[in-house]
Structure formats: structure tokens, C-alpha cells
């Protein structure tokens, strides 16, 4: 059936988010993935994380007494070009839409930092210790910043309005809240298969969004972009009512243990103990299994791991097991496990 193209692909059964209490750094680990899907998803998520998440940034700066960015200010150690470069690194969170204006006014001697900026409304400075410029004794500076929201990187010439007043200096705007993204692909194991992919993403943000949320937003963007390519509805498979009513246990119990891809040693031990179906196996306790000839702790752990992946475990009680027509039921339900 055509739906097996996507229904039978392995999907991650866990995604771990590791932050160690940091708002700006996160490690995301997803496994297992089909071979090759780690690279596919890692590259796609990285590109979207860096280019498509919205954020806030300074778009222009106006300094009292300065007409253009190639000026210098008496008593200020940095020239205007350096000040503009420092302003670009201010990390901002703004919930609403822009543009909005912020002001900083300070007298020397001392250092002007992002924390000296007088914010308005829902604008928050995330790196208040970031240095903008240094003032000597008797120096004074007043700057006004224009802040807006957007996505990606916008160069200064696109922030230059035609009707901008003299002295308004446009700034390159890095709106993306994600600063760095790297990923690596490693092999991981699922059951007896050793070459599935494990995807590890390392994310650094400016603090306006957590790494976990950033990945969620990027995945949602990809989901929306890909949805247009799906030109069919999901096939609905309905089990006959009489079959549902007839079966009093999980159909997976009708699967034979020789289909579990166990090691040869474990499979032979089960065969020698006349354990044919998963339903036979799960009713055995760990102690009973360890009394089986040639069956050791390694085989026990292997079987427990395989059963756990199916939501089962040893020592379960199935009152209606085994059914009288077990072979017929196994054939009837073989496409449901």
C-alpha cells in the first residue's frame, strides 16, 4: 500500500533538550532516524533557524552633533563607525510591532553600555553589559535608536528611508534571534539495526528565544512550507467491527518471536523452550527466562529492550492466552502489528 512509504519509516522515539540552565545555548538530540534523514533534517533546520525566525534589531541611529558615520565625537574614544558596529550587537526582545525609538544620554567619564538605554513599552535589552562607547572627562553624548522587527539579515542601505533626516545613520540589522547553529550525525541503534542516524543540533541564541522554542518554530515553518506538496488525504484504515470485538488482547502478541530479529543465541533459546509467539514470551518472568538452558543476562537484556520498544515487558498476565484459533488469528491480524 502506498501509505507504507511514510508510515513504515522509523521516527524518533525521543528528543532530548539539554540547556544546563542557559537561556542562550541548547543541545537538541533526536534519535533514531532513517539513514540519511539526519543530514536532511539537520541541514533544513539549520537553514531555517538562521534565516527565517523573526526578531528585533536596531535599524538606525542618530547622534546629536553627528551628520554622518565617518565623523568623530569630541571626548568619545570610539569614532562613529565603531559605535555603529557596537550598536549592531545589541540584543533586543520586542513583543509588539515596530518601529520604536529608544534614547541614551550620558556624561563622562565612563562607559556607555546597552543597559544605559532608556527602553520603551515592550522593548527589552538582553545584553545590558554590552559596551557601546567610552566617554572621557567632560564628554557628553546623546543617541536615539530606531528599533524594528523582521527576519534574517537586512543591510544598512535597505534601512535607509528616502525621507530620512540628515544625521540619521542606517545600520545593518541582524533580526535572527539565532546566532549559531551546528549539527552532527552519528550512528545509533534501534533493536538489532545499528546504522540509524542520531541528529545532534547545537544552538546559540541571543536570549530572546530559547533553543527549544527556536527548533519548534523552525520545524513549524518547514511543516507549513511542505504541506502544499501533499496532494492527497491520509488513507483511513478501519478494522472490521467483528474482529475488534473478537480479540481481547493486543494483536502484537500474535507475532512470532522469530520475527523479532533477535541474535541467533537468543532465538535458539526461545525455540528450545517452545516459545513461539510474543504472547508466550511476555508471560515469562525474568527468573523463568534465566533458568532456560544457555540463556544468560545478555540475552535477557536484549529481549527486554525489544519488548520495551513495543510497549511490552516480561511478567505480563494475559488471561485469555493462548486463544484456541491462534494460527488463524495470527494470519488475520498480521498487518496490524
UniProtKB/Swiss-Prot annotation:
EC number(s) from the headed UniProt entry: 2.7.7.6
InterPro entries registered for this protein in UniProt: DNA-dir_RNA_pol_insert, DNA-dir_RNA_pol_RpoA/D/Rpb3, DNA-dir_RpoA, RBP11-like, RNAP_asu_C, RNApol_insert_sf
GO biological process, one term: DNA-templated transcription
Similarity section: Belongs to the RNA polymerase alpha chain family.
A GO CC annotation given for this chain: cytoplasm
Gene3D superfamilies to which the protein is assigned, alphabetical: 5' to 3' exonuclease, C-terminal subdomain, DNA-directed RNA polymerase, insert domain, RNA polymerase, RBP11-like subunit
Domain of life: Bacteria
Reaction equations catalysed: RNA(n) + a ribonucleoside 5'-triphosphate = RNA(n+1) + diphosphate
Start and end residues of each stretch annotated as Alpha C-terminal domain (alpha-CTD): 249-337
Keywords of the record: DNA-directed RNA polymerase, Nucleotidyltransferase, Transcription, Transferase
Single GO term (MF): protein dimerization activity
The name this protein goes by in its record: DNA-directed RNA polymerase subunit alpha
Function: DNA-dependent RNA polymerase catalyzes the transcription of DNA into RNA using the four ribonucleoside triphosphates as substrates.
Amino acid at each position: 500500500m502506498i501509505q507504507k512509504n511514510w508510515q513504515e519509516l522509523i521516527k524518533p522515539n525521543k528528543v532530548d533538550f539539554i540547556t544546563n540552565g542557559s537561556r542562550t545555548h541548547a543541545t537538541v538530540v533526536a534519535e533514531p532516524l532513517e539513514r540519511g534523514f539526519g543530514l536532511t533534517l539537520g541541514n533544513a533546520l539549520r537553514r531555517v533557524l538562521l534565516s527565517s525566525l523573526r526578531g528585533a534589531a536596531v535599524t538606525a541611529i542618530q547622534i546629536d552633533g553627528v551628520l554622518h558615520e565617518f565623523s568623530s565625537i569630541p571626548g568619545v574614544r570610539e569614532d562613529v563607525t565603531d559605535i555603529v558596529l557596537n550598536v549592531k550587537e545589541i540584543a533586543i526582545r520586542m513583543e509588539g510591532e515596530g518601529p520604536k525609538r529608544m534614547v541614551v544620554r550620558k556624561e563622562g567619564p565612563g562607559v556607555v553600555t546597552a543597559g544605559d538605554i532608556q527602553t520603551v513599552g515592550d522593548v527589552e535589552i538582553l545584553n545590558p553589559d554590552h559596551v557601546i562607547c567610552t566617554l572621557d572627562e567632560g564628554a557628553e553624548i546623546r543617541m536615539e535608536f530606531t528599533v524594528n522587527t523582521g527576519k534574517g539579515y537586512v543591510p544598512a542601505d535597505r534601512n535607509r528611508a528616502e525621507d530620512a533626516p540628515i544625521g540619521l545613520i542606517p545600520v545593518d540589522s541582524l533580526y535572527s534571534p539565532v546566532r549559531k547553529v551546528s549539527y552532527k550525525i552519528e550512528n545509533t541503534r534501534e533493536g538489532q539495526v545499528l546504522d540509524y542516524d542520531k541528529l545532534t543540533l547545537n544552538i546559540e541564541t541571543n536570549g530572546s528565544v530559547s533553543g527549544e522554542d527556536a527548533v519548534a518554530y523552525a520545524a513549524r515553518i518547514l511543516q507549513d512550507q511542505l504541506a502544499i506538496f501533499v496532494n492527497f488525504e491520509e488513507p483511513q484504515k478501519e478494522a472490521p467491527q467483528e474482529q475488534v470485538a473478537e480479540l481481547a488482547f493486543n494483536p502484537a502478541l500474535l507475532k512470532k518471536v522469530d520475527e523479532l530479529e533477535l541474535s541467533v543465541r537468543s532465538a535458539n533459546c526461545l525455540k528450545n523452550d517452545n516459545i513461539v509467539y510474543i504472547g508466550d514470551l511476555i508471560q515469562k518472568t525474568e527468573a523463568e527466562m534465566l533458568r532456560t538452558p544457555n540463556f544468560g543476562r545478555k540475552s535477557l537484556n536484549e529481549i527486554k529492550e525489544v519488548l520495551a520498544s513495543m510497549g511490552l515487558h516480561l511478567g505480563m498476565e494475559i488471561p485469555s492466552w493462548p486463544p484456541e484459533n491462534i494460527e488463524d488469528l495470527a494470519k488475520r491480524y498480521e498487518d496490524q502489528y
